[in-house]
Design a protein with these regions (language model features):
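A glycine-rich, often tryptophan-bearing local segment used as a flexible ligand/cofactor-contacting loop or short
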Residues: 76, 81-171
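Short linear motifs at secondary-structure transitions and domain/linker junctions
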Residues: 17-19, 48-53, 77, 132-136, ...
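Helical hinge/lid and interdomain linker segments adjacent to catalytic or ligand-binding clefts
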Residues: 2, 12-14, 18-111
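Catalytic beta-strand/loop cores that center a nucleophilic Ser/Cys/Thr
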Residues: 34, 40, 58-59, 69-70, ...
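Nucleotide donor/acceptor-binding cores
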Residues: 9
Length: 206
């Protein structure tokens, strides 16, 4: 990255989902953070191992996860990944070190083990009973529960929660944000979780 407040800090973006073009959005986000604020950014993609072409529909391969060894922050925007143990270990080791994690959208269900249920990391699956709720519930606060609103049919208007308007994350953020997606439901919030926005599901996508 260029000179800026983020100089010397390394952010690794882990992408891989089929609906929201995380491979595009996170690349643009990383460029902003790198060029305007000085962060060193690495963006990793779901990739076809045979062709080397980025393909979010490939759920079993995200090359370059070793970059997490020297990461200061992991941003994960992924859905239903089932990675080889050697690759998944980098994510697990990073989290187990207690380093910060930002999960976006379907990161609550970033992992789903279907083929290799004997993997030592199968408990990270979104509906795990052994490690209740897997990565989503244990690390991000909740796993995937349901869609709130009709999936791919209804949009959302997010309203800032006045109670937390002074939260550092909310600096420069407008009071209302329109999203051309529905939202995900949660079962229960813990006392340690702060709701920064409340979602209002709209009729239609406009």
């Amino acid at each position: 990255g260029k000179e800026g407040i983020g100089s010397g800090q390394h952010i690794v973006f882990v992408t891989g989902e089929e609906y929201y073009r995380s491979e595009e959005g996170m690349s643009m986000f990383a460029k902003i953070l790198s060029q305007r604020y000085g962060y060193d950014c690495t963006v990793l993609f779901a990739t076809d191992k045979t062709t080397g072409i980025i393909n979010p529909n490939i759920s079993t391969y995200i090359p370059g996860l070793k970059a997490l060894v020297k990461a200061d922050l992991m941003v994960i925007f992924a859905r239903f990944r089932e990675l080889p143990d050697a690759d998944m270990k980098h994510i697990v080791d990073y989290v187990n070190e207690g380093k910060p994690v930002v999960g976006i959208r379907n990161a609550t269900h970033a992992f789903r083990y279907v083929k290799n249920k004997q993997s030592p990391y199968a408990e990270w699956t979104f509906n795990s009973s052994k490690w209740r709720g897997g990565f989503g519930q244990q690390i991000l606060g909740d796993t995937w529960v349901s869609h709130y609103g009709k999936f791919l049919q209804e949009a959302t208007l997010a309203h800032a929660n006045a109670k937390h308007r002074s939260h550092p994350v909310m600096q420069g953020v407008p009071d209302k944000i329109f999203c051309r997606t529905d939202v995900n439901g949660v079962n229960k919030l813990t006392p340690n979780e702060n709701v920064l926005f409340h979602a209002q599901v709209l009729s239609g996508l406009n």
